[in-house]
């Protein structure tokens, strides 16, 4: 996989603010998440009720990657329905991504994503087809934590500067 480019860009601002390029948002999305950026994964329970979980995603090769225990609510939801949203507050932007999530067990991807997590401060290591570390989020449960790719098909970004603006980009799945 490689970085993806939008197949459609639409200015959805209702106040006449100018368009802004995908690159501005993409560069912020690809930066290490860290603690100063809040990210939330939205899923749907099998009975239709919504679920939201704070997560620590990393950007790799044009997609986001997340981890989770197979026993966690978010992963159980994704196994039943892979559609999800990812909402992130970035410096200068509020961004919501819509897409699908799939489990990753490719050793090369696991190794590369674990290295990105280590660069971001979480000491993740590959253990079989999942990741492990001395610690994780308080609600993560015990290791191992499996890796999942969030492949987005739509991105909506609100620019938070004085000039404002709102854009929607669509991507091939």
Q: Where are the model-predicted features located?
A:
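Short secondary-structure boundary/capping segments
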Residues: 30-31, 56, 76, 138-140
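Secondary-structure transition/turn motif
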Residues: 70-71, 161
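Short, basic/aromatic recognition patches
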Residues: 12-39
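Generic structural signal for secondary-structure transition and capping sites
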Residues: 37-38, 83, 122, 155
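Short beta-strand segments
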Residues: 36-70, 76-78, 84-89, 96-100
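Short, intrinsically disordered, mixed-charge
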Residues: 79-84, 115, 119
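Charged, gly/pro-rich active-site loop segments
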Residues: 1-21, 93-173
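A generic structural signal for alpha-helix starts
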Residues: 72-73, 108
């Amino acid at each position: 996989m490689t970085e993806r480019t939008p197949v459609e860009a639409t200015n959805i601002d209702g106040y006449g603010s100018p368009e802004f390029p995908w690159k501005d948002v993409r560069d912020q999305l690809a930066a290490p998440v860290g603690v100063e950026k809040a990210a939330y994964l939205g899923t749907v329970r099998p009975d239709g009720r919504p679920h939201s979980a704070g997560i620590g995603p990393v950007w790799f090769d044009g997609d986001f990657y997340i981890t989770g225990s197979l026993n966690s609510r978010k992963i159980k939801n994704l196994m039943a329905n892979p559609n999800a949203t990812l909402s992130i507050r970035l410096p200068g932007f509020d961004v919501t991504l819509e897409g699908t999530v799939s489990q990753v067990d490719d050793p090369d991807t696991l190794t590369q994503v674990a290295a990105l997590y280590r660069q971001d401060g979480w000491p993740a290591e590959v253990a079989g087809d999942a990741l492990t570390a001395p610690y994780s989020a308080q609600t993560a449960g015990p290791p191992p934590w499996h890796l999942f790719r969030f492949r987005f098909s739509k991105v909506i970004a609100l620019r938070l500067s004085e000039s404002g603006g709102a854009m929607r980009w669509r991507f091939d799945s």
